[in-house]
Amino acid sequence: IIYDHSPQKRLGVYYYESGAYPRKSSVIYDRANSSFCSLSLDELPEDIYAKTKIFHISSITLALDPSLKETAIKMIHKFHEAGAYISFDVNYRASLWSEEEAKKTVEAIFPYVDFLFVSEETSRRMLQRTGTLEEIMKGYADTYGCTLIATTRREAVSPTHHNFNSKIYMNGNFYEEEPYNNIEVIDRIGSGDAYLAGVLYGLIKFG
């Protein structure tokens, strides 16, 4: 935990508005002048890199602030050089940056990524990948050397009912769970992070 004692800084927040069919839910990010956006490498203890097994980061971090993006990319390089696994979630948010800028930035990071989390929609739209889902996932491994690629597919039947399933590609094999159809959504905030945390927990515990 890093504490920011500056009286000018604050916690970043965002505002979530639930959807009502046919209108989708929406989010407004309010991260300007937050402590997180002013993070610098000097604030991190130097021994943190060698002590870390998995360093996880999301593309939202890269989109919030130019200075933070530069710091985050340097952190990826330093953790990678120290031998940590790099876990990266390509959760693209159109309200934070353009598809062109996001694509250019994340593709430059992919060669350092061991565990890649990317939805089928993001692969096809922002990253402009074509082919079957299996071909797209295998392509990340073949092109960038990613060890694990996990992708999710979410279909919104309505704002309160979704279909969901996921697929993982690792060591030349695909793993897929039975889909969850028409599940009732109580609150989906953080559901993607929970899925990701489960995958990383499984990797740490079972390899």
Predicted regions and their residues:
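Conserved N-terminal subdomain of the carbohydrate kinase-like
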Residues: 1-59
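Active-site beta-loop-alpha junctions enriched in small/polar residues
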Residues: 32, 60, 91-95, 121, ...
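Glycine/threonine-rich flexible loop motifs
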Residues: 61-70, 98, 126-129
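Surface-exposed amphipathic alpha-helices with a cationic face
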Residues: 73-80, 141
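Conserved phosphate/ATP/ADP-binding segment of small-molecule kinases
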Residues: 82, 96-172
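Hydrophobic beta-strand scaffold residues
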Residues: 86-87
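Conserved post-catalytic alpha-helical subdomain immediately downstream of the catalytic base
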Residues: 179-207
